[in-house]
C-alpha cells in the first residue's frame, strides 16, 4: 500500500469518519489503523475478500468526494502552515479567518 495514499486517507478519516456508517468506519479502521489485510478482514467479518476490497474503494471515493466539496483537510493544512510560519498573532488571526470564510 502506498504510504502517501495511506496518510491521505487516514487524514480524511480523522475529519470525515463520523459521516460514514459504523460498519464503514469499522472496516476502514481495520484496514488503515489496524493494518489488517483484505483477507484478514474478510475472515473476521465472514464476507468475501472482494466485498472488503469493494467497500474500501467505495469509502475512499466517498471520503475524497467529501474533501472535494468541503475542503476541511485543505483548510486544516493551510491553518497549520500559517501557525508554523506566523509570529504576529493579529496577522495570524486575520489569515485564519480568511481561510475559514472561503
Q: Model-flagged regions — what are they?
A:
Residues 55-58:
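Residues within the DNA-recognition helix of helix-turn-helix
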Residues 60-67:
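C-terminal flanking helix
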Residues 48-49:
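Helix-turn-helix DNA-binding motif, specifically the short coil turn and the N-cap/start of the second
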Residues 4-16:
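Short, Lys/Arg-enriched N-terminal segment that forms or immediately precedes the first helix
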Residues 71-92:
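Intrinsically disordered, low-complexity basic tails/linkers immediately adjacent to helix-turn-helix/homeobox/MYB/SANT
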Residues 41-42, 52:
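Hydrophobic positions on the alpha-helical face of helix-turn-helix-like DNA-binding modules
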Residues 22-34:
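Short amphipathic alpha helix immediately N-terminal
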Amino acid at each position: 500500500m502506498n504510504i502517501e495514499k495511506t496518510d491521505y486517507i487516514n487524514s480524511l478519516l480523522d475529519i470525515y469518519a463520523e459521516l460514514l456508517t459504523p460498519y464503514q468506519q469499522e472496516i476502514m479502521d481495520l484496514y488503515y489503523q489496524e493494518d489488517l489485510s483484505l483477507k484478514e478482514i474478510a475472515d473476521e467479518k465472514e464476507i468475501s475478500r472482494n466485498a472488503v476490497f469493494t467497500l474500501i474503494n467505495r469509502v475512499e471515493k466517498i471520503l475524497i468526494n467529501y474533501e472535494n466539496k468541503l475542503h476541511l483537510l485543505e483548510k486544516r493544512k493551510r491553518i497549520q502552515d500559517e501557525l508554523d510560519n506566523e509570529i504576529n498573532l493579529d496577522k495570524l488571526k486575520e489569515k485564519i479567518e480568511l481561510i475559514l470564510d472561503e
